Amino acid sequence: MTALFQQLPSVDKILKTPQGEQLVTEFGHSAVVNCCRHLLAQAREKIKIEKKLPHFFTDFNHTIAEVNRYLANQQQVKIKSVHNLTGTVLHTNLGRALWAQSAQQAALTAMRQNVALEYDLEAGKRSHRDNYVSELLHELTGAQAACVVNNNAAAVLLMLATFAQGKEVIISRGELIEIGGAFRIPDIMAQAGCKLVEVGTTNRTHLNDYRRAINENTALLMKVHSSNYQICGFTCEVSEQELVELGKEFNIPVVTDLGSGALTDLSRYDLPKEPTVQEKLVQGADLISFSGDKLLGGPQAGIIVGKKELIQQLQSHPLKRVLRCDKVILAAMEATLRLYLQPEKLTEKLTSLRLLTQPLEQLRQQAEQLKAKLENLLKDDFLLQIESSLAQIGSGSQPMAKIPSIAVTIAEKNSEKLTALLARFKKLSTPIIARVENDKIRLDLRSVTAIETLLITLEELNQDQ
């Protein structure tokens, strides 16, 4: 064993070779030294346990190659591009909405250059960073004003902290939602320092339930859109319009957490109907919060629209500065909202809506291309078929609603082979993320953004054998 330890080169010896000097030039002295120490520590452990050298210390060229590979891998960003073939278009784990081309360009400009973020070019003086987005939302929804923070949970927190800290907020028991990551409305209320007052039952809440709970300490009446679940059957809920009338009677604001935040009626595209921001405003809600990276199709943000005097109070709260968006997000959000000024062009320019509305025939053509490519690469090892599929919007939007789609399925009696193929998909330079149903890998085309790029990536399957 001692002889094996003696075969290990010193860090200094590696650094003083021409190859080592080249690595220092490329990656820097500290990084190369740390890498060599790491690999030598690995080698010593292997010698202790297995009584042999690791392969990369059996030959000096292998050693240099391993150091180079390790250092190059350190430079690789781990949040990397993937091919989404899950059939879930707004996939939370894969980053939700893909930005439109104009949003990408606006964000890139904001990254590279100084921009008029809080500067009024006409007046030549300081302005507010939310102004451009607020003006657009006023035009698109009819809201008096708007406020932007970094996500919808932050928007709800800001509303509660501003208007209900130390006071009570009344909400239906059937609307105490939990979203991903065990994140619950009651937890946000507790964090905001307000008291939750539940009324009604899980499946039925009446206007009188709210009325009986109102007292001198009631600060808000709250509605939460249950976008990620449905209660069916013997049910009853109070509409915003009814709640607003009750709020006016007692001079209590009504706030609505709309969640997904559609700015256009999805049913016009033969998609499942989702309440729009405009509809909630017409019903009289004082403040409405919603997400920017779900149905709206933009960057992650929490948007609050509503009455000007209430928005001004939100803007003045200390939490607003904590939760505010940076120039890149605001630039991308502005560009995304401007697409809604041309509604006839939305399915062409808004990426998420384009994916959701792709014709089945187009998806079938893509499926045929994908099947042909896979048959060529996988030979006769697997059974490939083109099948009808059911995709979904994702991100908690309309979870019960399915969207017709087309998928390529891969079957194999040996489940270990399917598992191995899935692993190969994930090791590609741009990993392929699929789903498994009924002992088949299902590659759903509804969520694919670029079939040509996917086909090129698949060529790597020939190289990993």
UniProtKB/Swiss-Prot annotation:
Keywords from the named record: Cytoplasm, Protein biosynthesis, Pyridoxal phosphate, Selenium, Transferase
EC number per UniProt: 2.9.1.1
Cofactors named for this entry: pyridoxal 5'-phosphate
Family listed: Belongs to the SelA family.
Signal sequence region: none
Designated name of the protein: L-seryl-tRNA(Sec) selenium transferase
Enzyme class at the top of the EC tree: transferase
Database matches in SUPFAM superfamilies: PLP-dependent transferases
Compartments, record wording: Cytoplasm
GO function terms (MF aspect): L-seryl-tRNA(Sec) selenium transferase activity
Organism this protein belongs to: Mannheimia succiniciproducens (strain KCTC 0769BP / MBEL55E)
Pfam name, any one: SelA
Gene3D superfamilies: 3.90.1150.180, Type I PLP-dependent aspartate aminotransferase-like (Major domain)
